[in-house]
Design a protein with these regions (language model features):
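N-terminal non-catalytic structural scaffold regions of very large proteins
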Residues: 1-202
Length: 202
């Protein structure tokens, strides 16, 4: 379920957040968020950043998109707003994010940049994070599909930022996650099985 919020905190003005569950039941739930930086009296900000699991620092949107294989600014913006003609009013909202990507214009540099904020500090480690930790419900090596979903999250957030959509009402039953009995029993069994293993090996 995608949750879009406004007035997040002093650092971020808007965010789009999702809990992503892999089809592989052995893998834990991963949480990811796309956020817009709040303007300050001295800086206009409003660049878009992404919180990626196992990456210590929020990654600028355009750098993450390049790491996923989309290189040009136009291709990245089209992935986010889909129709450049119909949604041309949104294009200017990406200007701070274009500048935020700095001098990183290709995939290799993007992967190297992200690697500096990971434990492994290598490109293979970053690729492992993008495969297994970023939006695992989409699949492991489906980088193009992950970029499209990331673009969808960004567009939903921008529409709330422009007042074209309301933020998600988390109290509404429409947005409540219903856990099925099988899932609940699996989680309970896993918890007690882990405890039993600890007692056995003590």
């Amino acid at each position: 379920m995608l949750y879009v919020r406004d007035k997040v905190n002093d650092i971020y003005s808007h965010s789009a957040e999702i809990r992503s569950v892999s089809e592989d039941a052995s893998k834990p739930v991963r949480t990811m968020a796309v956020r817009m930086v709040t303007p300050t009296p001295t800086q206009s900000n409003e660049q878009i950043v992404v919180n990626v699991p196992n990456v210590r620092k929020p990654v600028p949107l355009f750098i993450l998109m390049r790491a996923l294989g989309l290189v040009s600014d136009k291709e990245i913006i089209e992935t986010c707003i889909l129709d450049m003609g119909k949604n041309k009013d949104f294009i200017d909202m990406f200007i701070p994010s274009v500048h935020d990507a700095g001098k990183i214009f290709n995939r290799t540099n993007a992967l190297q940049y992200i690697a500096t904020f990971t434990k492994g500090k290598t490109i293979p480690h970053v690729l492992d994070i993008l495969s297994n930790y970023l939006l695992p419900h989409i699949g492991e090596m489906n980088f193009r599909e992950k970029a499209l979903f990331l673009g969808h999250m960004t567009f939903e957030m921008l529409m709330v930022a422009r007042g074209m959509k309301k933020p998600t009402d988390r109290d509404s039953f429409r947005f409540k996650r219903v856990e099925l009995p099988g899932t609940l029993i699996y989680d309970l069994f896993k918890e007690y099985y882990t405890l039993q293993q600890r007692h056995v090996f003590q």
